[in-house]
């Protein structure tokens, strides 16, 4: 197995320079796993060292760990088509041009401003989201938005009668035996904290994302908590294609551009990682606002799990983004060089 010494060095430097409190990480090479952790899980109001088996607020990793798989399973079962319109399942949405494919590839062009969005009760937020509109980017640009995956969750609920977070639990977490992963942690102390908020105080064991906080189990864009080792199980299931949450017909397609124009670097939820060298690769990845990221190479059966709480104690911590991208670049280079 590759030693990944440069990637680990860069992770430790990230912590030592105070960019993040700590990092839990894992490298996957087929059935081999190398994992570790470094740093703290909490700085304020008091210091706590990072421990094994802690739950991380995955933020937008919820989209690809959960919602994407539920949607593709419904398509595979014949309950849904990628060409189906949003309007067909949510009649309150007036526009008839936006399809499931647009939503799952972030090419819907849905836009608009909702005043006081983070202070609305769930029903008001639901109605306000359905009153947004399609802008000029429709189908022409990939513009990442939580709204696309909130709507996908509502589509899945309209079909099954079950809220999206329960569907993710039943269709992904339980079959993969991701036994620690949950949308409702029972004990805050087993969770890595996120922001120290002016309005909410220390956010720990409760979802950080404001829309997910309001919508609760009806949010398909964020809300999942998971341990590093559960995410290793998730990645290995996809890489080995054993009990994969991605249905067989979509296994090959998941590393291909699925946008309507076929040129926007997005698969079903996943972002595609461009690679400029000659090594065979099928790299997909996704990140979460709280400081999380996962990478998969379907050609080489390798994966990377990176979990931090970059919004602790303060958000947004913009310098983190370039450093995270550099760590992923180091990882990709290191695994290819070794290969």
Predicted features and spans:
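Short, P/G- and charge-enriched loop/turn segments at secondary-structure junctions
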Residues: 12-15, 55, 138, 256, ...
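Active-site-proximal loop and beta-strand segments within enzyme catalytic domains
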Residues: 42-146, 315
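Short, gly/Ser/Thr-rich active-site loops of penicillin-recognizing serine hydrolases
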Residues: 255, 314-339
